[in-house]
């Protein structure tokens, strides 16, 4: 019986990169209600509306485990929740360059995200990052659904992410 050695011929970069230069990444904890907006955004996304050669990833609360995915793309668009004191479902686009540029943490995944940015900067592998935040008013432990108001913001977030992708592609 012959061994299939092909499965062992991939490098880490090959495994985490599909050759696309833009990654759309949703992060959050879907077990915490509205805090899971980024994950819910990715899970409900109609990728057919987007140009070809875009990567999409449900990053969950991945933190450090997302480094190989992020470093293998030139531009990363992140969707996440924030409790920044703004009116609920305010959608904000940030372009953080340093970990201190990220909004206040909500849960453990943001701690990992900020540290991940520091690590990528240190390794000189920091892509251009765009961060869409959706303001939420509360987190509900062990609640799998988004509140109606936050769920209703997903089409607008999708439209804003699509517009940004098209602007990036046209430049």
Where are these regions (language model features)?
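Helix-loop-strand module that forms the ligand-binding subsite of alpha/beta enzymes
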Residues: 78, 82-129
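Phosphate-binding/catalytic loops
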Residues: 115-171
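Secondary-structure boundary/capping motif
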Residues: 33-34, 142
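A generic local secondary-structure boundary/capping motif
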Residues: 11-14, 67, 119-121
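Conserved active-site and cofactor/substrate-binding residues in soluble primary-metabolism enzymes
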Residues: 36, 40, 61, 111-114, ...
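SAM-dependent methyltransferases
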Residues: 1-21, 166-171
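Nucleotide and nucleotide-moiety/phosphate-recognizing core
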Residues: 15-25, 33, 40-97
């Amino acid at each position: 019986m012959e061994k299939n050695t092909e499965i062992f011929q991939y490098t880490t970069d090959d495994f985490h990169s599909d050759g696309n230069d833009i990654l759309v990444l949703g992060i959050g904890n879907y077990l915490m209600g509205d805090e899971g907006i980024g994950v819910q955004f990715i899970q409900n996304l109609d990728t057919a509306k987007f140009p070809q050669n875009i990567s999409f990833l449900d990053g969950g609360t991945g933190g450090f485990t997302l480094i190989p995915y992020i470093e293998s793309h030139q531009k990363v668009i992140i969707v996440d929740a924030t409790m920044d004191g703004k009116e609920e479902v305010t959608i904000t686009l940030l372009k953080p360059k340093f970990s201190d540029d990220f909004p206040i943490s909500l849960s453990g995944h943001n701690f990992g995200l900020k540290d991940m940015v520091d690590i990528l900067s240190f390794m000189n592998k920091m892509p251009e990052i765009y961060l869409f935040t959706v303001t939420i008013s509360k987190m509900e432990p062990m609640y799998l659904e988004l509140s109606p108001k936050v769920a209703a913001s997903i089409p607008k977030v999708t439209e804003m992410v699509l517009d940004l992708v098209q602007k990036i592609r046209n430049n």
